[in-house]
């Protein structure tokens, strides 16, 4: 196995034991990225590599290692999504609107990685302002799936997922508003975690939909995911949505023992012909192995799950319209040149600075808050959101973990996102976006491949702030399928 194929914990052990030095490690990864970028079908996981800075940080990390310092991420190269603040570094959310913008401070999640010794190697590509599921709406080019370059990596954290899957980073940060960590993790065959809403600070992450957004890690295995989640989690006094409650040691909880734990299977996620046969078969086989390890299978129902995609669209677009209001070319954003009145200036800034997908969501969200639709659609969506929360609360009275496919299908071909069947799209959204609507923790873990050798993901969901059981079940699955 090549060094860049190792996990965070494995490479830390080699750094600690002086089997490899940090500058050599960072230089090797950067050279691999640069070599790949010469290809016509380059993966294009990164918008920017912090080459000189990363190499300098690696030298300092090695000095600290030589002096006996021991931190969980010391000398480990990690990546961050292009919507996370890293002081004095470019941050564009893959949009022309923020072209040339530099972050004025470092996000707490990024700072916590740095405080634990990580080397931030670069910023990764994404769908513009995190609006998309394929990483094809980026203003700076598409990212390809490392497992098959003709396919999408998923989105919106497709660059982060591709970087980890291609061994261009040992781990990465992404953001998840409606599956934007878990779905690309599934498509690229890696692990992706969306922690409980309020477990990890959102400060320093460009807001898409403030009641849904959550920052989380993408890694090569469950143990690394547990480690990174532990590091970035916790109260931040500047972040109003984080709760001041203890963060468990998730790595220590990975004992592989799930005997007596109850797994819930929601009929709404399985009783449909829209799930690809390979996906359903692999997920059910994995559940069977968990049962063999002593877990109990319980049939449950989430009756309002079928409305999830529509509820998500209404809530998300309204919040998008609100959050995107600041990008007017005056406070933030693209500054058009010419003689304009105020309305013309706003129009030109947004028309040039924002891509179609983003403009469409702003328009739909604005429409939803108008008199005609506010009560009949938006307010109704909020009520159904509450019913969905009650469904999950009731389910968790009887089970410890809910298990589902992360996506009913595997990664599609590049350039085909507008050809997806609407019913399938609604179902795919419901697997992941429902979890954001109710603020639960969930993670995607690899679960075999389909007939075309494309990765399949299995999703583990637990009640709020019970990431321990989520990681424990995911780890048991991982051990059973090695």
From Swiss-Prot:
One family name in Pfam for this protein: Amidase
Active-site residue numbers: 81, 156, 180
EC annotation from Swiss-Prot or TrEMBL: 6.3.5.7
Leader sequence segment: none
Stated family: Belongs to the amidase family. GatA subfamily.
Assembly and oligomerization: Heterotrimer of A, B and C subunits.
Protein name: Glutamyl-tRNA(Gln) amidotransferase subunit A
